[in-house]
């Protein structure tokens, strides 16, 4: 597996002429007129779009612990820090619903990692091969997620095995965890099958999926949000595995356990992707502490 080098997030603000405020770091977008961007290194510049609604501008907030990389010299120095993530990376999570992604443009927009859906239930995501190979080609760090429709522990184990089989050709290119994604849609599906989903069952399924994934040599984690974690995941499993928390608010109020990734927005724009895309921060220091 290639080592994760220390790329620290560039936290920038872009002021758009004739617009009364500077765009916040909640949305990355391509600004066609390049003179509107800052003078930072093109390789690291983040181009932020703006929203007209003042309320919308408060949706997300960049983390306070982000270190600003001002030039290529600092970037090269950061790359030498023991092959570990030392700060905060900015990334996206994608699936077939994001269409045909231009990964070269995504990389150029400043995206440093992508969590790619490998599949759901027992089914491969139709865009998985295209997405992961595009990310690899453009030196974007890779994580995986699997949307679960399991309603027994055995089903969760089988999903993990199917996932491991699908991602096997790219094992050495996967830098971040493989995440178990279980949501209210998963619960609704189980109910339609006449199955009851309890907190104990969901906790056991998550643990079974993650344990199975780690047996194949991957790091494992759980995707969740504050409400779902309170209702369906026991604290023991949340403490055991890497946590990817979804909270589309200005600040993250999840305090149940440590988390190493935060999905902070779902209506963002990134050059190379048509329509909205989910945005994430990956906290390297927290990730290192939990391993």
Describe the residue ranges of each PLM region.
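Structural recognition of alpha->loop->beta junctions
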Residues: 164-186, 233-258
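Functionally critical loop-and-helix segments that line ligand-binding/catalytic clefts
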Residues: 26-95, 236-291
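Substrate-binding cleft of extracellular glycoside hydrolase catalytic domains
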Residues: 84-108, 112-208, 214-216
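Positively charged n-region of N-terminal signal peptides that target proteins for export
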Residues: 1-4, 8
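Bacterial N-terminal signal peptides
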Residues: 8-16
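Sec-dependent signal peptide cleavage junction
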Residues: 15-31
């Amino acid at each position: 597996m290639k080592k994760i080098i220390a790329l620290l997030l560039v936290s920038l603000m872009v002021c758009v002429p004739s617009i009364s405020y500077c765009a916040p770091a909640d949305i990355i977008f391509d600004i066609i007129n390049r003179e509107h961007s800052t003078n930072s290194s093109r390789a690291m510049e983040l181009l932020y779009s703006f929203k007209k609604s003042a309320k919308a501008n408060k949706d997300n907030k960049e983390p306070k612990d982000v270190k600003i990389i001002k030039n290529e010299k600092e970037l090269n120095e950061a790359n030498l820090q023991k092959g570990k993530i030392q700060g905060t990376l900015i990334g996206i999570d994608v699936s077939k619903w994001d269409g045909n992604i231009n990964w070269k443009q995504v990389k150029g927009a400043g995206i440093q990692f992508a969590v790619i859906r490998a599949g759901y239930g027992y089914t491969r995501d139709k865009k998985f091969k295209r997405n992961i190979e595009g990310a690899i080609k453009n030196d974007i760090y890779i994580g995986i997620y699997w949307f679960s429709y399991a309603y027994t522990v055995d089903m969760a184990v089988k999903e993990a095995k199917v996932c491991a089989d699908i991602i096997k050709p790219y094992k050495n290119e996967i830098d971040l965890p493989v995440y178990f994604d279980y949501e209210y849609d998963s619960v609704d599906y189980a109910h339609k099958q006449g199955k009851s989903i309890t907190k104990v069952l969901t906790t056991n399924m998550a643990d079974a999926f993650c344990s199975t994934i780690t047996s194949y040599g991957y790091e494992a984690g759980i995707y969740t949000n504050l409400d779902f974690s309170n209702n369906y995941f026991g604290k023991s499993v949340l403490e055991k595995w890497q946590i990817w928390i979804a909270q589309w608010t200005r600040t993250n109020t999840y305090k149940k356990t440590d988390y190493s990734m935060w999905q902070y927005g779902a209506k963002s724009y990134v050059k190379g992707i048509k329509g909205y895309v989910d945005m994430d921060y990956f906290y390297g220091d927290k990730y290192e502490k939990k391993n």
